[in-house]
């Protein structure tokens, strides 16, 4: 029903069923994992009105599991990418995996999937830094930031006749700012992640 993927590792499709509605994947050597993908295999859909909450569990200093809600998968959203690298020192949250006898070993984390009502999924709050930001939201933010900067800088524009000479201050012509703004927009449209290179 579910699959789990970590970069550089084989895809896991054989989840351990620990209850009728709960499934677990082991993640050995979890300290070296940054992101995990959880997805439906497409062979068995969720029953009508149901979905799956996705949890991440890692052993605390005493070896006890610390569970954190990452998000969910549904028939309408059959896959999700989660960032888990920053979660290993966070606090746990309420979870449905309670006191189940799940075999645990040190340095092995787990992804848990709990089949629940869609209404219940909508009311849950995932841990804040588990979601991977999308390029669209980043592009929107960058566009708003560019617009704000250009509008702010332009609000100080004066003509040469209005300028008061001041040898200690530097001035940037408005057309230079406009040229930078247009160049940045063009590059952002071509590749939203160009700034990483």
UniProtKB/Swiss-Prot annotation:
Kindly list the residue ranges recorded as spanning the membrane. Answer: none
Residue segments, region Flexible linker region involved in nuclear import of HSP70 proteins: 124-134
Q: Please tell me where this protein is predominantly located.
A: cytoplasm
Which keywords appear in this protein's UniProt record, sorted alphabetically?
Answer: Cytoplasm, Nucleus, Protein transport, Transport
Q: Name one GO biological process term.
A: Golgi organization
Positions of region (Required for F-X-F-G repeats-nucleoporins recognition and nuclear import):
18-55
Give one Pfam family. Answer: Hikeshi-like_N
Q: Name one GO cellular component term.
A: nuclear speck
Instruction: Tell me which InterPro entries the record gives.
Output: Hikeshi-like_C, Hikeshi-like_N, OPI10
The subcellular location is: Cytoplasm; Cytoplasm, Cytosol; Nucleus
The molecular function GO annotations come to: Hsp70 protein binding; nuclear import signal receptor activity
Q: What does this protein do?
A: Acts as a specific nuclear import carrier for HSP70 proteins following heat-shock stress: acts by mediating the nucleoporin-dependent translocation of ATP-bound HSP70 proteins into the nucleus. HSP70 proteins import is required to protect cells from heat shock damages. Does not translocate ADP-bound HSP70 proteins into the nucleus.
Summary of subunit composition and partner proteins: Forms an asymmetric homodimer; required for binding and nuclear import of HSP70 proteins. Interacts with ATP-bound HSP70 proteins. Interacts with NUP62 and NUP153 (via F-X-F-G repeats). Interacts with HSPA8.
* Family, similarity comment: Belongs to the OPI10 family.
Name this protein carries in UniProt: Protein Hikeshi
Lineage, top ranks: Eukaryota, Metazoa, Chordata, Craniata, Vertebrata
């Amino acid at each position: 029903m579910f699959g789990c993927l970590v970069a550089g590792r084989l895809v896991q499709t054989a989840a351990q069923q620990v209850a009728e509605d709960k499934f677990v994947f082991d993640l050995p050597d979890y300290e070296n994992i940054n992101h995990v993908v959880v997805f439906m295999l497409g062979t068995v859909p969720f029953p009508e009105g149901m979905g799956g909450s996705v949890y991440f569990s890692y052993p605390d200093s005493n070896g006890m599991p610390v569970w954190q809600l990452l998000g969910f998968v549904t028939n309408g959203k059959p896959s999700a990418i989660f960032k888990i690298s920053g979660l290993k020192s966070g606090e746990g949250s309420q979870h449905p995996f309670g006191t189940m006898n799940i075999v645990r070993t040190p340095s092995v984390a787990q992804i848990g999937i709990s089949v629940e009502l869609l209404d219940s999924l909508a009311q849950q709050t995932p841990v804040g830094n588990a979601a991977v930001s999308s390029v669209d939201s980043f592009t929107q933010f960058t566009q708003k930031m560019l617009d704000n900067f250009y509008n702010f800088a332009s609000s100080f524009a004066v003509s040469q006749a209005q300028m008061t000479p001041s040898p200690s201050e530097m001035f940037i012509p408005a057309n230079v700012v406009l040229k930078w703004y247009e160049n940045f927009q063009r590059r952002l449209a071509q590749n939203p992640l160009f700034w990483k290179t």
